[in-house]
Amino acid sequence: NPEKNHIKNEIKEICAKYSLERLPRNSEILSSATEEQFSKLQKILLKKPVKSASGVTVIAIMPKPFACPHGRCTFCPGGVEVNTPNSYTGKEPVTLSAIENDYEPEIQIKRKIEQLIAFGHDPTKLELVIVGGTFLFMPDDYQRNFIKSCYDAINGFKSNSLEDAKTNNEKAKMRNVGFTIETKPDYCQQKHVDMMLDYGTTRVEIGVQSL
């Protein structure tokens, strides 16, 4: 990309001129750019453009670990005992982020939105993906509070109820246009489907190991 190479060469020349110790990160350049400069530099300095190439940016979040009601599967490396969600080792980037933020959905989402903006992505259309094992076996109150916190994080303010949070998101600056939940066949029955529809779920993921 000639334009990208030209910009990078200019950055190097400026750094050499002012004897800077290191090249600034793309995110640092974008965060200090004016609105006009940002629009010109965004596509050139954008990291991982595939993340938002479709116009929808995916954010993966994790609930806190809960012990599976059926016991521990032989292939599961995680769990309450090691403070990692079921099916995860604790070394994955999404898991490390969740642990760092105490599994609080609102903090996880806000931090990831900040990162997306810093790297030049447009987070106005989001798809949330709840990973970390079977979400639907967790206590109902925890599920509803978790989902509401997701909408609150995107809306930028707290709503009085889950229904209010979903309604407010329809006109929010950042909108959740897709919502994915991981589950298993035994937690994908009629009552579970009704719950997911109530949460605003648009897609369900079922791991091949459970089939």
Kindly give the residue locations of the regions a language model identified.
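Flexible, acidic/Gly-rich N-terminal and inter-domain linker regions that tether
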Residues: 1-108, 112-158
